[in-house]
């Protein structure tokens, strides 16, 4: 009898506390939103989930290529229980990336829309009480041309670590980064959307049980680069308090356009059938195009693919961040050298084989035979110019350095991929971390070296720590998908704990975790994988080699000055 009473009492408590009888409704600055409660196995307290909350006015019509405007208020209870559309992009590439990276049991097919400035919230807070939990704001990757917030389910991270997880969207591709390099279309619209989302968090997250005074921004790939840009931007001051860049920083050359951006703007205008006489003419014409017409233009531009035929110096596989004088007053290199950035604790890391499989596969590198000779490697490295910006005359030395030590064509292929990974990810990440450390701010570095069981069957078994592999651990995929080993479950628990500790305290260390040294003059960092351990001097030899090599090019080509014959 007492057992039945205990069960009934437990059920009553569960209705009141575990799964409240009515779904959550929260009052935001703009109006009320209705969410849903979702329970994760092993947790009595459900997570309140709100999907598709608008944080800005839809950037349509005359608002295309302009900074985001505040959302319009509403007077009813807005239903926030279904996924928002992802921002306009190449639907096939976007879907492929989502399927490869999602931590959900089933990938969610998403609609496309130019009206896409929405965010999702996962809060484990008891909304009847005044909680103040740390907030973690996720910025998705996808080369600034594809991607969606809803690929990443914040449920496991929120439940396991008692943090509020917010995943945000931002305009992509032409919509997000079209720049004429002048006042007609400055560019960086997608980054301004990220800032608008962070302002929304400041104004509203307390109502969801989050602490606006403890906001961590974290992102991967182009999301990591975005985090790094926000760390450098005066416009982001006080909008976040810690930052994590996974596999991407503002020195990732492919994502930051320096110099004249006009030729790329003209290429886009021509592809859209617009005149290119002046910036004003191009912008006016592109604003008149329908979303479908700009999608066709996007496909013509062949973003995310390697051009094997044309002049690599005129190829643009990505549209990127620009030095607009506002978001970025100067180049990332100059802002770092002058130590003009937001001095928040910063975690920077990358994976052991960033060019292992997913990027060369998506970009169409001709490596299906799995081997490479020196001559082909040099030619491919030149074709990779828009990714790595290695001048033609430096290619023999760079290729020899990486591939020269072996005659095995399979090893040559692997070393070629290491070269690309170092120039695009590892070396820029270490340089950013060193600058941050030198400014006297807590800095932590990691290298992720693990092959998730959720990897695509097409990925060679030898690839361990591919681009994006850490996402499964960070977002607790083993607790949402089936089939993870005990080792993988433990790894994900540890990674979530490290990331959330960092969000809580600006320091990833905590009880029962391997010690993660701060990145100081000794350059200690953490190797994360089946065996997680501290090590030193991450990629220091590679940084030295590339710094010296790139300096040669700078020395050989002094600034052009007019030469006057007397």
Swiss-Prot record:
Top-level lineage group: Eukaryota
Protein name per Swiss-Prot or TrEMBL: Liver carboxylesterase 1
Gene3D superfamilies: alpha/beta hydrolase (3.40.50.1820)
Signal peptide: 1-18
Name of the coding gene: CES1
Phosphoserine: residues carrying this PTM: 379
CDD domains: Esterase_lipase
UniProt organism field: Macaca fascicularis
A Pfam family it matches: COesterase
EC number: 3.1.1.1, 3.1.1.13
UniProt GO BP: cholesterol metabolic process; negative regulation of cholesterol storage; positive regulation of cholesterol efflux; positive regulation of cholesterol metabolic process; regulation of bile acid biosynthetic process; regulation of bile acid secretion; reverse cholesterol transport
Subcellular location: Endoplasmic reticulum lumen; Cytoplasm; Lipid droplet
Keyword presence, Glycoprotein: yes
